[in-house]
A protein has these predicted regions:
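N-terminal signal peptide c-region/cleavage motif recognized by signal peptidases
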Residues: 14-18
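N-terminal small/polar-rich segments of proteins
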Residues: 19-85, 120-135, 139-141, 147-150
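Extended, loop-rich substrate-binding clefts of extracytoplasmic carbohydrate-active enzymes
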Residues: 116
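Bacterial N-terminal signal peptides that target proteins for export
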Residues: 1-7
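Short flexible/disordered coil segments
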Residues: 94-98, 136, 143
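Mid-chain, structured segments of secreted extracytoplasmic proteins
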Residues: 66-113
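Hydrophobic alpha-helical targeting segments used for export or membrane insertion
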Residues: 8-12
Length: 151
């Protein structure tokens, strides 16, 4: 391959990746929970309910690196991975940058739509986690991440 052909091939590769469409996982490594560890508590039993289950409250400081996608329009989704333990449900409020919502294990839900205008997408979620009483073990990791869908 000649130098000119290699330069053209490289330019096409860069151009095609800049126009990518589809779903990508976003870098949310700076997102963390406060406190880092939380103890699930038994929910009060309510007559007529089959299972009171367990719940916990946690604050999630969200910081998503969006530099690579600045200027692009699309939707950001929160994804709650499922695992081999009891199903988890999360419900949250926000400070306004992201959408409040509700999700169950194995699902994803919209938390932002529009053009990404900054290098990071920041917000704070106040999240209530709920699980049935069939949850076994003393610890469980809250496995969630964020995805960006582009048209």
């Amino acid at each position: 391959m000649t130098g000119r052909a290699a330069a053209i091939a490289l330019a096409l590769l860069v151009w095609s990746s800049a126009g990518q469409t589809g779903t990508v996982r976003l870098d949310d490594t700076l997102t963390h929970t406060v406190p880092a560890n939380v103890q699930m508590q038994w929910r009060p039993f309510v007559r007529g309910e089959r299972d009171a289950g367990m719940e916990a409250w946690v604050r999630v400081n969200v910081r998503i690196d969006t530099r690579e996608w600045m200027g692009r329009s699309g939707q950001v989704y929160l994804v709650l991975d499922s695992d081999d333990t009891s199903a988890m449900e999360a419900e949250w409020t926000t400070e306004g940058r992201l959408l409040a919502g509700r999700i169950r294990s194995g699902e994803r839900t919209l938390v932002y739509w529009g053009t990404l205008t900054t290098a990071t997408l920041d917000d704070q979620l106040v999240m209530r986690l709920r699980s049935l009483s069939d949850w076994r073990g003393s610890t469980r990791r809250l496995n969630f991440h964020f995805e960006f869908d582009t048209p």
